[in-house]
UniProtKB/Swiss-Prot annotation:
Spans of repeat TPR: 87-120, 155-188, 192-225
Keywords: Endoplasmic reticulum, Membrane, Repeat, TPR repeat
Any one GO cellular component localisation term in the record: endoplasmic reticulum
Oligomer status and interactors: Component of the ER membrane protein complex (EMC).
Top-level taxon of the source organism: Eukaryota
Role noted for this protein: Part of the endoplasmic reticulum membrane protein complex (EMC) that enables the energy-independent insertion into endoplasmic reticulum membranes of newly synthesized membrane proteins. Preferentially accommodates proteins with transmembrane domains that are weakly hydrophobic or contain destabilizing features such as charged and aromatic residues. Involved in the cotranslational insertion of multi-pass membrane proteins in which stop-transfer membrane-anchor sequences become ER membrane spanning helices.
Topology in the lipid bilayer: Peripheral membrane protein
Name recorded for this polypeptide: ER membrane protein complex subunit 2
Family of the protein in this entry: Belongs to the EMC2 family.
Organism: Xenopus tropicalis
Amino acid sequence: MSKVSDLYDVTWEDMRDKMKTWREENYRNSEHVIEVGEELINEHASKLGDDIWIIYEQVMIAALDCGRDDIAMSCLQELRRQFPGSHRVKRLTGLRFEAMERYDDALQIYDRILQDDPTNTAARKRKIAIRKAQGRNAEAIRELNEYLEQFVGDQEAWHELAELYINELDYAKAAFCLEELILTNPHNHFYYQQFAEVKYTQGGLENLELSRKYFSQALKLNNHNMRALFGLYISSVHIASNPKASAKMKKDNVKYATWATSQIKKAYQLAGRTMTDTQTSLKAVEDMLETLQITQS
């Protein structure tokens, strides 16, 4: 099999730096990680210094993704030899058991880690991940809430809890979690968009108004957010057609829907769609808008 360095005319330093970039950007390209990482380990181990251990870990996790337990076990054995008793290496053992669906064995490992170090957040999160993998969402929710009582600033955990509540159709609690995220991340357009989607799903005129406002804010923060743009359109449409909405509210929301339609058209055109494709894609949108305008006239 040809070497990466020969195929792409790169040095071992280039490959090392590429592995670092992939780690830092959480780039999920497991097959490439294995290919590059194995060559670094097999051909350049003596040059890597302490970097070799993080590369072993990186290759192991990628191997689990690809179902290559032989590679994962080889990396794990090297890490165990270098770091006997390490909680981090024990957690990797737990990850391997998870990949094999040996959840009870994985839980035992995480429990032992937590006995030694009750503040080990990685082990607690893996236990929650196992509950989710087993479809035990109620337990995952309970454990996440307990976790957040101690680590209230963990944004990843708040978002995971919001997703679990959404899966359980508990939209009020999901909205609360997303509000917490917005408070700590006021410039993250995705959280505004997701909060808007939850309020839209809850329904009712008040929630629809909130939904439209938060879709609008998501667009202000990122005017390329097409999901928020469509959300602005559809929430405006539903407000304008709501019998409880005032005449002014209906008129304003027809205007918002009209603006959103024009922006969607522009986005399609900028993306290189032909006029025919654009018109076809937007036909249903425009038909609904026309119906609204007739209703308001």
